[in-house]
Each structure stands twice: as structure tokens, then as C-alpha cells.
Amino acid sequence: MYKVVVIIALLGAVRGLDKICLGHHAVANGTIVKTLTNVQEEVTNATETVESTSLNRLCMKGRSYKDLGNCHPIGMLIGTPACDLHLTGTWDTLIERKNAIAYCYPGTTINEGALRQKIMESGGISKTSTGFAYGSSINSAGTTKACMRNGGDSFYAEVKWLVSKDKGQNFPQTTNTYRNTDTAEHLIIWGIHHPSSTQEKNDLYGTQSLSISVGSSTYQNNFVPVVRARPQVNGQSGRIDFHWTLVQPGDNITFSHNGGRIAPSRVSKLVGRGLGIQSEASIDNGCESKCFWRGGSINTKLPFQNLSPRTVGQCPKYVNKKSLMLATGMRNVPEIMQGRGLFGAIAGFIENGWEGMVDGWYGFRHQNAQGTGQAADYKSTQAAIDQITGKLNRLIEKTNTEFESIESEFSEIEHQIGNVINWTKDSITDIWTYQAELLVAMENQHTIDMADSEMLNLYERVRKQLRQNAEEDGKGCFEIYHTCDDSCMESIRNNTYDHSQYREEALLNRLNINSVKLSSGYKDIILWFSFGASCFVLLAAVMGLVFFCLKNGNMQCTICI
């Protein structure tokens, strides 16, 4: 009986060892992120990398902008009446509106999209006269009711409609040459008039067959006006097709024709670089922005956005994803609430995280004769935070490097195979989205691995300090074989623990405890032996009581056969 009491007392001594545990921060509800190895990894903290909101206005503070209003960019070159206030000028931001007017007399511009893009990317337009002169039999001031100006018939301001001076007279063969004496390329635009009927053609240019030829060192083309009836637009059944080319410095361009030509009055020089915005958003001179789209301004520091693939300025890359969460915390292991027994409230990082530790990523919990305590480890926490800080900026840098390479490759493809813009843009978006997902997943994997590594480094630091003075329990804790008060615990935390100071006490306690430790097999035998002995003692006591009662006549036993 005494042996059993001693064993129980010594086992209680084992359980009563001072204890220090290492753990990491945890939260009740973490955030799910994607890593290279797990698409549903829960972390303590994460930040969104995809911007989904914008300001519904154009922030123009600090910008020299030109709002074209009803004027279409093409109208700036040909001189549409709606563009009379925008024929020249400089800007850093050009704003195009949805219902802008490009043409008064109905028509179109060949390769209009490319020309419009050149204008929208420019930082201004200056004009130079072509110096073309015409004979006395040519009227260079043709007008139309479709292009009203100051209440009267007019025409495009930057080109001249050349017609016969006398109605029905054959237009004379005419040749004009423009030489670019500038050091920059000039953009020259001209038109071909397609009459609505033979009568109109004869009245304007005579009965002869019409032909226009245009040539420079880089451009050659011949045009024949097409006479046919067309639906009326602005009261006109005729059409004007505008053509354009770039004249290099020192080059000449020659026009030769006998009617049907809309001649340039001035050539344009696109100067500088600027932003071109297509938007119906109102202008706000009180806010700043570096990125714009049709819905307004995107003011964000995030590397990605899912608002539109068509943005201008210094913008986040478009990805076809609602969300890409970037881990800024460690793997989350919610705390398992345990009973408050002797060690019920203390468990290390191997078992679970600690939700109560809000002042650090890593820390300690201890229990000794003075009670329990908890403290963060600022060194390991700071080491982890230093690697997290700037992660978003590093992601942006990686994004820009990867995406600029992709964009360059696709720009070259566009240049080589022509008008495949929509196809290439869709392909770029798909690749950007894949690259974005991969980059974020890689960063998340690195963050989690790094956080785990810092936890293990801290654990190893404590293990090396304690040496044989403590034993690991397999749950992220150390059971200490000597008395360790609060100052002792503090020395372990701040890495100043003196192993030799407690060596003798720890060794003695270890020997005393180990001498009574039993293997699991012997423990089972003792338990069964104890159970059997208890049953035997109980049975003996009962039988003794029965015999005592029978002897004293207090109990009778009758046996019937």
C-alpha cells in the first residue's frame, strides 16, 4: 500500500515540473489564400492585391488637360466645325467623349483606329501650311450644308474641297508636292470624294473619268471615285474617304489628279507624349490620379485591378480575377480550448496556435510555482515582419518585369501580323492572370515557409539553451527539471539563460524522477494487480463480516435440500 502511494506521489511530481512552451499567433477566423502546395491555406493575415473600386470622376489636379467635348480626335486633323477650338495646342491629358463628332460631311477615315491612337498618345498638335496653289479654273473653297459654321455653308477647316470653277467644266490635271523640311515626321491627310450620282460628278468635276494618285518614298496609291446612290446622312448621299500617311523629314509627297480630291491645307505634327482618355466621367480638379479608365480614376497602390483591360497611365495590371489574397501573416492554427488543469492551458505550437497573443507573431507561455505568464518574442517577430514589409512593392516590381516582357512580345506580334489587337489583348489578359496567380501563390508559399522557419529557429534557440536541464514534450514545450521562477523564465526568453547554474539540481531531479518512471507495459500490470488486490480485500472484508455475524448469532444461514 505504501508503494502505491509513493508511485502516485512521484508521478505527481513529474506532472508538477515547471514548464515553458513556445507558440505563434493565431486568430479565431483566418483568411484563405492560395499557395503552391495548397489552394485553401488559412493564414492569420492577408491583404487583397486586386483593386475592384474606382472614383467615378476624372481627377485632373496638377494636369494640363484638354477636354474635347463634342470634338472627335480625327476632327482635330481635318477641321470639323465641332473642333474649331481644338485644332492645335499642347496637353498631357486628352479627354475624348462618347458622342464626339468626327465628320460633318458623311464619310470615314481609312485606318481610323490607328490614327486616333496616334493622336490620343500625343502631347499636342502643331500645324504647317502645305503651300499648295491652284489655277484659276479651280475653286478651292467648296462648301456644303452638312458643315455649317456661323450659320452658313462651310467645310472642314484643314482641307479644301477642290471643284471646277464653272459648273460642268472638266477639272484640269493638277499636281501638288509637299516637302517636309522639318526634323520630325509630319502627318498629312487628304480625302477622296465619292459623288452620289453621275450628275453630281459631272457638275463638280466634268464628264471625264476621275483618277487620283499619291506617292512618296514610303507610300504609293491610286484612287478612283466611286459614283453611286447611298443613304442620306446630314442631307448628303455622297461620301468622303480620308486617307493619311506620315512624311519623313526630307521626304516629298506628290498628289496628281483631275478631280475628286479633298486637298490638305495644313499638315500636322504630333508633339510629345500624353495620356488619351475615353470617358464620360466628370472632371474633378480637386483630386489627383495617375490611372484612368472609362469609369473614372483608379487610385490604388495594389498591383492588380479587375475593372477594365483598357486603362491609361500608371495603372495596376488587369487580371480576370475577383480576388488574389497575398499572405502577410503565418499559417493559422486556431487555438484548441482546453481544460484549466495543472497544464491544461499550456500547449506549444505543434499542437495549436495562441489566439491571446496580439503583440507579436511568436512568444512564450510558462507555468511555475509563481503562476502562469505569457510574453511575445520581439526578435523573431521582427525578423518575420522585416521579410513581410515591402512584400506588396516587391510583388509590383516582379509584376512589372514579367508583364512588360509579355507585353513587348505581343506588341511585336501585332506589328508583324497586323490587325489582331483583340486576339492579342485577350491572350495577354489570360497570360497576365496566370502570371498574377502564380506570383501571388509563390509569395504566399514563401511567407508561410518563412514564418514556420522562424518558429523552428526560436524553438531551436531555446532547446540549445536548456540542454539536459529540460525535456521536450513533443508539443512545442519543455519540462524543466529544476525550479525556474519568473526571472529564470525571463532569462530563457531573452537568451541569457545560464545552463550551468541549474545543472546539478536538474540532474538530481532527473535521476529521482527517472528512477520511478515505468514503462507502459508495467503500468498496465500494476493497474490490473491493484484492481485485483482491491477486489480481494473487499471480498475478504465482506466474508469476514458474514462469519462474524454468524458466530454471534446475528445472522442465520438455512440450507434447504
Swiss-Prot record:
InterPro entries registered for this protein in UniProt: Capsid_hemagglutn, Hemagglutn_HA1_a/b_dom_sf, Hemagglutn_influenz_A, Hemagglutn_influenz_A/B
Localisation: Virion membrane; Host apical cell membrane
Extracellular domain ranges by topology: 17-524
GO biological process terms on file: clathrin-dependent endocytosis of virus by host cell; fusion of virus membrane with host endosome membrane; fusion of virus membrane with host plasma membrane; viral budding from plasma membrane; virion attachment to host cell
Post-translational modification summary for this protein: Palmitoylated. In natural infection, inactive HA is matured into HA1 and HA2 outside the cell by one or more trypsin-like, arginine-specific endoprotease secreted by the bronchial epithelial cells. One identified protease that may be involved in this process is secreted in lungs by club cells.
Gene3D superfamilies: 3.90.20.10, 3.90.209.20, Hemagglutinin Chain A, Domain 2
Signal peptide region: 1-16
Disulfide bonds: C21-C477, C59-C287, C71-C83, C104-C147, C291-C315, C484-C488
GO molecular function, one term: host cell surface receptor binding
Glycosylation sites: N29, N45, N252, N422, N494
GO cellular component: host cell plasma membrane; membrane; viral envelope; virion membrane
Keywords from the UniProt entry: Clathrin- and caveolin-independent endocytosis of virus by host, Clathrin-mediated endocytosis of virus by host, Disulfide bond, Fusion of virus membrane with host endosomal membrane, Fusion of virus membrane with host membrane, Glycoprotein, Hemagglutinin, Host cell membrane, Host membrane, Host-virus interaction, Lipoprotein, Membrane, Palmitate, Signal, Transmembrane, Transmembrane helix, Viral attachment to host cell, Viral envelope protein, Viral penetration into host cytoplasm, Virion, Virus endocytosis by host, Virus entry into host cell
Pfam families hit by this protein: Hemagglutinin
Membrane topology: Single-pass type I membrane protein
Residues with site note (Cleavage): R340, G341
Lipid-linked residues (S-palmitoyl cysteine): C557, C560
Primary location group: virion
Transmembrane domains' residue ranges: 525-545
Residues in compartment: Cytoplasmic: 546-561
Quaternary assembly: Homotrimer of disulfide-linked HA1-HA2.
Role this protein plays: Binds to sialic acid-containing receptors on the cell surface, bringing about the attachment of the virus particle to the cell. This attachment induces virion internalization of about two third of the virus particles through clathrin-dependent endocytosis and about one third through a clathrin- and caveolin-independent pathway. Plays a major role in the determination of host range restriction and virulence. Class I viral fusion protein.
Entry's family note: Belongs to the influenza viruses hemagglutinin family.
Further facts: Major glycoprotein, comprises over 80% of the envelope proteins present in virus particle.
Protein name, per record: Hemagglutinin
Protein source organism: Influenza A virus (strain A/Chicken/Germany/n/1949 H10N7)
Originating gene: HA
